[in-house]
Design a protein with these regions (language model features):
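Membrane-helix entry/capping segments
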Residues: 1-24, 53-56, 68, 109-110, ...
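Residue-level recognition of pore/gate-forming positions within transmembrane alpha-helices
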Residues: 28-33, 243
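A hydrophobic alpha-helix feature that marks transmembrane segments and, especially
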Residues: 287-310
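Generic structural signal for small/hydrophobic residues in well-ordered secondary structure
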Residues: 15-18, 37, 47, 63, ...
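Hydrophobic alpha-helical membrane-associated segments
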Residues: 31-35, 39, 229, 289-295
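Alpha-helical transmembrane segments
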Residues: 31-59, 305
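Short amphipathic beta-strand/extended segments in non-transmembrane regions
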Residues: 61-65, 79-137
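Mid-to-C-terminal secondary-structure elements
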Residues: 101, 115-139, 147-283
């Protein structure tokens, strides 16, 4: 320990003797460390934890019709989703959702919030437990109510309702329609769309208006995510869903005139969130971070060599 303290004191004396070298080396190292820290933080958030708050994200997959690099439009109707969910043998569960901006009304002025319409098993499949209240029940999935149920995100609950647990059971207004809060999501969970943050969740047909969203196979509007069973690979699950999809297309050919192949990808590659659009930049960011680090090391080494020769 005494030797270590002596080395530290010697190093500090040398740094005081060469303030220009000290400042230059510190600035270069700080820039390199910040650049690399930013890149690797982004990698952690997009690849390792694309859905914060969800259980075992490695078994979650994005279910798409067509290829990843094709136009990322929501690929499934509710009826197709329901058949895929009920007939497969590869998934613990499959969820569907659709998101849009709506107005939180009833206050001094309307405020836009990001609202997701979700299937009733949404939170259960993701492994999320309510902080307060409860989540949706199966019978509430597509059955409308005169006063729909909603679930608040932790952030919206904190910022707009002062973190009051008593908000559960209270009425709100969404786009001038009355709704009832039945639950609050836990801190950290922001939804199943990688890189996006949902403020509120509702059922698929909250007002019970019916129409094409829950009755027509040609109305493709649901983004679909599945959780693989233990021991099932993406390839096996892909074949399973392809088989089901072929049966659906054969039974309803007029409602499936486009591409009907199924593609499963890790959630960080999902084109239905912010991460999907940024995934192609990952190799470029890694290369830039590596170059910055190498150049910094080379510059610091050059400064050190010149200082020692003075």
């Amino acid at each position: 320990m005494r030797g270590l303290l002596q080395d530290v004191r010697f190093a500090l004396r040398q740094l005081r003797k060469n303030p220009a070298y000290t400042v230059a080396a510190t600035v270069m190292l700080a820039v390199a460390i910040c650049a690399n820290g930013t890149v690797f933080s982004w990698i952690d958030g997009t690849m390792l934890h694309p859905i914060p708050g969800a259980r075992d994200m490695s078994s979650l997959v994005s279910v798409m019709r067509g290829q990843w690099n094709s136009s990322p439009t929501p690929p499934f109707s509710y009826l197709d989703y329901r058949d895929l969910r009920d007939q497969n043998h590869s998934f613990e569960g499959i969820i569907g959702y659709h998101h849009d901006w709506l107005a939180l009304t009833g206050g001094a002025k309307p405020e836009r919030i990001y609202v997701a319409n979700v299937t009733a098993n949404y939170f259960d499949v993701l492994g999320v437990k309510p902080l307060y209240g409860r989540f949706f029940r199966p019978e509430e999935e597509a059955a409308g109510r005169s006063i729909p149920y909603v679930i608040l995100s932790y952030s919206l609950w904190k910022t707009h309702f002062a973190g009051d647990p008593g908000i559960v059971g209270k009425p709100l207004e969404i786009a001038r329609h009355p709704v009832t809060v039945i639950g609050v999501a836990p801190k950290g969970f922001v939804g199943a769309a990688p890189g996006l943050r949902h403020d509120m969740w509702m059922t698929l047909d909250p007002l019970g208006t019916g129409g094409w969203r829950t009755t027509e196979r040609s109305g493709n509007w649901l983004v679909v995510v599945g959780r693989l069973r233990p021991g099932v690979s993406r390839e096996q699950a892909n074949q399973d869903l392809e088989t089901i999809m072929r049966r659906i297309v054969a039974a309803y050919p007029n409602d499936h005139l486009g591409t009907n192949t199924i593609t499963l990808d890790p959630m960080w590659r999902s084109p239905f969130g912010a991460n999907g659009y940024m995934a192609s930049t990952l190799p470029i960011l890694l290369a830039i971070a590596a170059m910055v680090l190498l150049l910094t090391c080379a510059n610091v080494a050059t400064l050190t060599d010149r200082k020692s020769n003075v």
